[in-house]
């Protein structure tokens, strides 16, 4: 929804909350006043706001009370030279821009932790040259869109982690080690070559390859999301009295993280499902609806 004033931002939050919306995502071109009004309106209802930001820096958003930032430092405008207030300078943050001032990056991570802003990593979108698992479920035209617009020449899952991706994992690890609430997400779907579910495995692999212990990567992928949603007492870990969906894996991903893909059975609400049959049922259809 396009917003033009702080009043319209607050009104939009109230309208969609009345329809049952439980959280909100701000996008690139909101002003600080508009974002602040949306956050205040959401918080009055006990709801949260996340954001893929640009016109507003991460530090500014933290001051406004945002609950989460999407894509970590990937979309941050804090490192853009001559950034103008309330204007998006365009383009993602480059590897060189992030590397130019390590002290500034570290201080920003500290600030996000201090302000209790969660940090959602979406690493798989930067790893489609090495890893694009699950694209066989795409409709042919959607798959062609991705393969024709692949950001980098296709490589192998065994290829070294690209330097830009390694840098982003490093920021996620630093945030996690500082006590920040790191969340795991995937972005984008469709022509971006990132397939939900499959890409969650890629996220876990990226974290482990970038220095996380396997247990830390799993925590970021499960319990931390539940904690952010305020549901950690019910979901997020396997414990007596909690609700838990489970997977049976033919391997040991704590030894070889790539074994996380070897899923034999998925248990959802106590019922076991064959993942191969589920995938075959949607093969060639994803993206049609």
Label each residue range with its predicted role.
Residues 44-46, 64-70, 115-116, 179:
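Glycine-enriched alpha-helix->loop->beta-strand junction motifs that scaffold or abut catalytic
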Residues 1-8:
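Active-site mouth loops of central-metabolism enzymes
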Residues 269-289:
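Extracellular/periplasmic ectodomains of large secreted or surface enzymes and adhesion receptors
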Residues 35-46, 113, 173-177:
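Surface-exposed amphipathic alpha-helices with a cationic face
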Residues 55, 72-79, 271:
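Short, acidic/turn-prone active-site loops that include or flank metal/cofactor-
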Residues 20, 42, 69, 119, ...:
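Divalent metal-coordination and catalytic microenvironments
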Residues 195, 213-218, 227-263:
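Acidic, glycine-enriched loop/beta-strand segments at the rims
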Residues 12-30, 75-210, 283-289:
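Active-site neighborhoods of metal-dependent hydrolases
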